């Protein structure tokens, strides 16, 4: 590598610890994992961190309904989440929880730094209170009639019918979603983070050129309309961290959740002698920090989070990498339509590399939604991975193994074609780095077409019938194996399981920097099936789960 080695910290948004991982979640974790694996292949020092977001009223109420304490519930869900991510070959260096000593200490320290600098304000607010559950109701736990358009059955913060936003205390005829009781209005003293004080810094960040254009434009809209102080308080009963010197007051989950990136990394660093937490989080750091997130949480990550970090003397993210939503067969994931697919149900029936490939073939650096069309999914995986890539190895390896004891030719049959494949590596590398994964896949599949055309034109099955052409047969089939090796090297960030099986077959590690040299006079292993075609019956079985 000519590029200097970078130190990079990468995170995904923290999954909420009140339910299973589904294929919508997996888009982000697969996108980030492909980028991380590519950066590692190029020699960079990358740490890939995540955790469960384990606080909040929703978790407290679900645990109560399940008859267990919240700590036990989040521990069980954390293990399920880790199993799902491991099943999809997400290469986390560390996966933790926001309900940790490290996160508590960092949350308190950040709050105290903000308070010392005058960035924490205090005032009384009016909230809806459930008199039966003795609970202040979050916006999502109360429904009523929209005060703007009179649409019934709307949540306490915004109307899905007319798009208006409002305070829950403005709802007409509100009802608690927890108990069904009619809530009453009560006052409570809350702490606020003075977000407007950071308008200048956030404006500079928007115009730095680092952020995705769509993100910068959205931030500009929010800044133009004016920022408001952010309520970081929740009242007891609540599952989270208590605010120092404020009895019965807790940090709002959206304060300690992003601090969970730091808490998870701190726990990781404390177990490693050669990784420094401060090096990655101090304000003058030379390291890079990237957050992969969905478009639904841009507001928190582009405004609140960098302002909190700035105000507490920690570094800000180098960039936010934002993606869109997943639809299935053109519509929102739905339990009633059978398209709400849990990660664990997918893994019971299908290879994780199939979904990794399909998402990769559609992902870009933009914030567009991606459709998981199950018919197209089957067709594309079978056509690209089975027919084009794996078949390239199979149709050539049979001759090499049978006639030449697994030894590749001493000479390169077509050096011009070989170096066409090598030179394509720069375009593919640039696409991976820029998160234009679909562009990388298009480039790779165009090469796969070239490789198969070469084999078709050389017709080794015809050469095999002419004993005088054995040297040419070995050379042609070896060329097919060389091209398969390059293709699999380029696909390695996307297809870790298939890459590992391919490395065993090729009897060599797939590294980006080694493809300049073909495997001349090299012994390959006997060919075994590398990848199975997707059967429609497996899709049907998965949807029935």
Curated annotation (Swiss-Prot):
Q: Give the cofactors, semicolon-separated.
A: Zn(2+)
EC category name: ligase
Which EC number(s) are documented for this chain?
A: 6.1.1.10
Q: Name one GO molecular function term.
A: methionine-tRNA ligase activity
Residues reported in the UniProt entry to bind Zn(2+): 146, 149, 159, 162
Could you give the cofactor binding note from the entry? Binds 1 zinc ion per subunit.
Q: Which UniProt keywords apply?
A: Aminoacyl-tRNA synthetase, ATP-binding, Cytoplasm, Ligase, Metal-binding, Nucleotide-binding, Protein biosynthesis, Zinc
State where the protein is found. Cytoplasm
Q: Which domain of life is it from?
A: Bacteria
Q: Where is this motif: 'KMSKS' region?
A: 332-336
Q: Name one Pfam family in it.
A: Anticodon_3
Q: Name one GO cellular component term.
A: cytosol
Supply the InterPro entries for this chain. Answer: aa-tRNA-synth_I_CS, Anticodon_Met, Met-tRNA_ligase_1, Met-tRNA_synth, Methionyl/Leucyl_tRNA_Synth, MetRS_core, MetRS_Zn, Rossmann-like_a/b/a_fold
Q: Does the keyword field hold Aminoacyl-tRNA synthetase?
A: yes
PANTHER family, A to Z = METHIONINE--TRNA LIGASE, METHIONINE--TRNA LIGASE, CYTOPLASMIC
Q: HAMAP family from the entry?
A: Met_tRNA_synth_type1
The entry's family comment says: Belongs to the class-I aminoacyl-tRNA synthetase family. MetG type 1 subfamily.
This protein's assembly is summarised as:
Monomer.
Q: Which NCBIfam families match?
A: metG, PRK00133.1
Q: What is this protein called?
A: Methionine--tRNA ligase
- Per the UniProt record, the source organism is Hamiltonella defensa subsp. Acyrthosiphon pisum (strain 5AT)
């Amino acid at each position: 590598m000519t590029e200097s080695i970078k130190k990079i910290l990468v995170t995904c948004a923290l999954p909420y610890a009140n339910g299973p991982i589904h294929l919508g979640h997996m888009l982000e974790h697969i996108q980030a994992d492909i980028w991380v694996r590519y950066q590692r292949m190029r020699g960079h020092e990358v740490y890939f961190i995540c955790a469960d977001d384990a606080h909040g009223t929703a978790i407290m109420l679900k645990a109560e309904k399940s008859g267990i304490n919240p700590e036990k519930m989040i521990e069980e869900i954390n293990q399920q989440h880790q199993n799902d991510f491991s099943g999809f070959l997400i290469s986390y260096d560390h996966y933790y929880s926001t309900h940790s000593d490290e996160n508590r200490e960092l949350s308190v320290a950040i709050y105290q730094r903000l308070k010392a600098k005058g960035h924490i304000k205090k005032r009384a607010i009016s909230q809806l209170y459930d008199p039966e559950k003795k609970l202040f109701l979050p916006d999502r736990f109360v429904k009523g009639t929209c005060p703007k358009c009179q649409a019934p059955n709307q949540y306490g913060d915004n109307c899905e019918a007319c798009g208006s936003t409002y305070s829950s205390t403005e709802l007409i005829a509100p009802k608690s979603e927890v108990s069904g009781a009619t809530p009453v209005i009560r006052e409570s003293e809350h702490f606020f983070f003075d977000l407007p004080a950071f308008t200048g810094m956030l404006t500079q960040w928007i115009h730095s050129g680092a952020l995705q254009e769509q993100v910068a434009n959205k931030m500009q809209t929010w800044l133009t309309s004016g920022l408001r102080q952010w309520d970081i308080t929740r009242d007891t009963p609540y599952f989270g961290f208590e605010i120092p010197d404020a009895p019965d007051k807790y940090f709002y989950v959206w304060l300690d959740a992003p601090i969970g990136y730091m808490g998870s990394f701190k726990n990781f660093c404390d177990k490693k002698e050669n990784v420094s937490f401060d090096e990655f989080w101090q304000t003058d750091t030379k390291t890079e920090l990237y957050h992969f997130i969905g478009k639904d949480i841009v507001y928190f990550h582009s405004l609140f989070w960098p302002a909190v970090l700035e105000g507490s003397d920690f570094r800000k993210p180098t960039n936010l990498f934002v993606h869109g939503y997943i639809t299935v067969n053109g519509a929102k994931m739905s339990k009633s339509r059978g398209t709400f697919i849990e990660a664990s149900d997918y893994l019971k029936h299908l290879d994780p590399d199939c979904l990794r490939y399909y998402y990769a073939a559609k992902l870009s650096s933009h914030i567009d939604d991606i459709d998981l069309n199950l018919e197209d999914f089957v067709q594309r995986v079978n056509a690209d991975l089975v027919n084009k890539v794996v078949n390239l190895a199979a149709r050539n390896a049979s001759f090499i193994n049978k006639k030449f004891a697994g030894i590749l030719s001493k000479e390169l049959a077509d050096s011009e074609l070989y170096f066409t494949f090598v030179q394509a590596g720069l375009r593919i590398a640039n696409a991976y780095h820029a998160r234009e994964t679909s562009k990388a896949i298009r480039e790779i599949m165009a090469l796969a077409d070239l490789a198969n055309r070469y084999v078709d034109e050389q017709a080794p099955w015809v050469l095999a019938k002419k004993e005088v052409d054995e040297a040419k047969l070995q050379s042609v089939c070896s060329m097919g194996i060389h091209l398969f090796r390059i293709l699999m090297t380029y696909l390695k960030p996307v297809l870790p399981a298939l890459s590992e099986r391919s490395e065993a077959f090729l009897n060599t590690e797939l590294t980006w920097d080694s493809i300049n040299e073909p495997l001349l006079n090299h012994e390959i292993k006997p060919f075994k099936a590398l990848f199975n075609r997707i059967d429609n019956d497996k899709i049907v079985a998965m949807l029935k789960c």
